[in-house]
Amino acid sequence: MSADFEGYEQDFAVLTAEITSKISRVPRLPPDEKKQMVANVEKQLEEARELLEQMDLEVREIPPQSRGMYSNRMRSYKQEMGKLETDFKRSRIAYSDEVRNELLGDAGNSSENQLIKLREERAHLLDNTERLERSSRRLEAGYQIAVETEQIGQEMLENLSHDRERIQRARERLRETDANLGKSSRILTGMLRRIIQNRILLVILGIIVVITILTAITFFVRGH
């Protein structure tokens, strides 16, 4: 899975480098080439967005405990993408203004002032859009962190539950072992008691036999 992600990363790096180079060349190109270059950059930006989507899908399939590094890289790539789109918008505004100036020609100071005002309004709108995009990216990053934290918490709870079950099973085995040891101890005590009793009986029997033999010998001697 990480190999696919790294492949998308390499494609994204090459593509964004080409886009950056082309955006910087737009202002210096002749009108016909500018139009073609703008269309080409739009196509490549769409390809870059698709690569980001593929990379995002790959990151979502990574286990939560290993996802943090990839999520940070994704946030960096999305910020880079946002900057490219902003630079391209500014380049398009400059290109549109240039085309309009060529069409209008020398329409007078009034038209020029209106164009300047329109350019300022567009720049202001672009700044607001950029701020909204940054806020959206921060919210998305915060949401991803919250989701990852929740998943990690769930895994920790599951691990704790498994550990608790293992500890309980170990305690049960210890109780069973203690019970078995108690039974074994009682059995050994009973066996020792019977052995001692048997030895005492043997000693008593031995004494009785000896006394009987001695008595018989005594009577035998006296009879002769």
UniProtKB/Swiss-Prot annotation:
Domain of life: Eukaryota
Tissue specificity as recorded in UniProt: Specifically expressed in the neuronal tissues cerebellum, cortex and hippocampus. Isoform 1/VTI1A is expressed in the same neuronal tissues but also in lung, liver, kidney and spleen.
InterPro entries: GOSR2/Membrin/Bos1, SNARE, T_SNARE_dom, v-SNARE_N_sf, Vesicle_trsprt_v-SNARE_N
Membrane topology type: Single-pass type IV membrane protein
One GO cellular component term: neuronal cell body
Membrane-crossing segments per the record: 200-220
Any one GO biological process: macroautophagy
GO function terms (MF aspect): SNAP receptor activity; SNARE binding
Record key words, sorted: Coiled coil, Cytoplasmic vesicle, Golgi apparatus, Membrane, Protein transport, Synapse, Transmembrane, Transmembrane helix, Transport
Segments on the Cytoplasmic face: 1-199
Entry coiled-coil feature ranges: 31-92, 106-185
Pfam families according to UniProt: V-SNARE, V-SNARE_C
Gene3D superfamilies linked: 1.20.5.110, t-snare proteins
Record topological domains on the Vesicular side: 221-224
Compartments where located: Membrane; Cytoplasmic vesicle, Secretory vesicle, Synaptic vesicle membrane; Cytoplasmic vesicle, Clathrin-coated vesicle membrane; Golgi apparatus membrane
Chain's role: V-SNARE that mediates vesicle transport pathways through interactions with t-SNAREs on the target membrane. These interactions are proposed to mediate aspects of the specificity of vesicle trafficking and to promote fusion of the lipid bilayers. Involved in vesicular transport from the late endosomes to the trans-Golgi network. Along with VAMP7, involved in an non-conventional RAB1-dependent traffic route to the cell surface used by KCNIP1 and KCND2. May be concerned with increased secretion of cytokines associated with cellular senescence.
Quaternary structure and interacting proteins, as annotated: Interacts with distinct SNARE complexes that contain either STX5 or STX6. Interacts with NAPA and, to a lesser extent, with NAPG. Identified in a complex containing STX6, STX12, VAMP4 and VTI1A.
Homology family: Belongs to the VTI1 family.
Name the UniProt record assigns to this protein: Vesicle transport through interaction with t-SNAREs homolog 1A
Organism: Rattus norvegicus (Rat)
Gene this protein is translated from: Vti1a
